[in-house]
Design a protein with these regions (language model features):
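Mobile, glycine-rich extracellular loop/lid and propeptide segments
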Residues: 1-259
Length: 259
């Protein structure tokens, strides 16, 4: 929930009578391609294209994959994912970020998707933050993107009620002095450092806006705490806030979850 207290104070289904060692526990397992720091998300009664209606569990990995699994059974046709998408393309120079690039061992051996995505049940859209390492013509960059995916197929939302996915996350002409070195442009603006910044807290959807927050990899400077707001329909950036305008650190922390 958006209050981040991790409690449902109006629970009516789970009770001490049905949550016990005899009737409650692990149902089955699925294999995925990387470590999972983000909390799995559940959406009920999802019409999967060509596969009928399912209760779905959505799982994000540090290998930059999103899986949609049937939440009730892994038998028969449900032994395979209902769909899977991946956001790397090694042949084109797009990979996850190796831990060796980061100067920190907080997450190993790679960094991709850490923050828990968020679902808009009205539009059937999954919003997810993805970090990649991209090498083009010998030049390396570290890129953060906000993706909006159709929960029924995993396809990017490029047009319609939710459009323009994906978008690159950045802060342009944000005023401040920062540390006064590589975290500024020398013209009074603080830079969003794609290598140093790490999306930690779960994404939040509130009043049609998607919120993303950032800290670092093991306090490797220069980094800042950032909070971004994007329109949930157009994916246009509508607001940016930085916690440390005249210094560094100030990260917005979480282990990848938040709910």
């Amino acid at each position: 929930n958006n209050a981040r207290q991790g409690a449902n104070t109006n629970e009516t289904v789970l009770t001490p009578a049905n949550v016990n060692t005899n009737t409650f526990g692990k149902l089955f397992t699925y294999s995925v391609d990387g470590f999972v720091y983000a909390q799995p998300l559940v959406m009920t009664n999802v019409a999967i294209l060509g596969k009928g209606t399912h209760n779905v569990v959505l799982v994000a990995t540090e290998h930059n994959s999103i899986y949609a699994f049937d939440a009730d059974s892994n038998q028969g046709a449900n032994a395979a994912p209902l769909w899977q998408v991946n956001f790397i393309n090694p042949a084109a120079g797009v990979t996850t970020v190796p831990n060796s690039d980061l100067g920190s061992t907080d997450i190993t051996p790679e960094v991709g998707i850490t923050a828990t995505p968020v679902i808009d049940p009205i539009t059937g859209t999954l919003y997810v933050e993805v970090k990649t390492k991209e090498v083009t013509n010998g030049v390396t960059s570290y890129v953060h993107r906000l993706h909006a995916l159709d929960v029924t197929t995993g396809a990017e939302r490029t047009s319609g009620v939710v459009a323009n996915s994906p978008v690159v996350i950045n802060a342009i002409n944000y005023p401040g002095t920062g540390q006064g070195g590589s975290d500024t442009d020398g013209a009074g603006h603080v830079l969003f450092n794609g290598l140093k910044e790490h999306s930690r807290p779960a994404l939040t959807l509130l009043n049609g806006k998607v919120y993303l927050a950032y800290a670092s990899h093991g306090d490797q400077t220069p980094y800042h705490g950032w909070l971004f707001e994007y329109d949930g329909h157009t994916l246009a950036q509508t607001s940016v806030y930085k916690t440390t305008r005249k210094c560094v650190l100030g990260g917005c922390w979480q282990g990848g979850g938040g709910d």
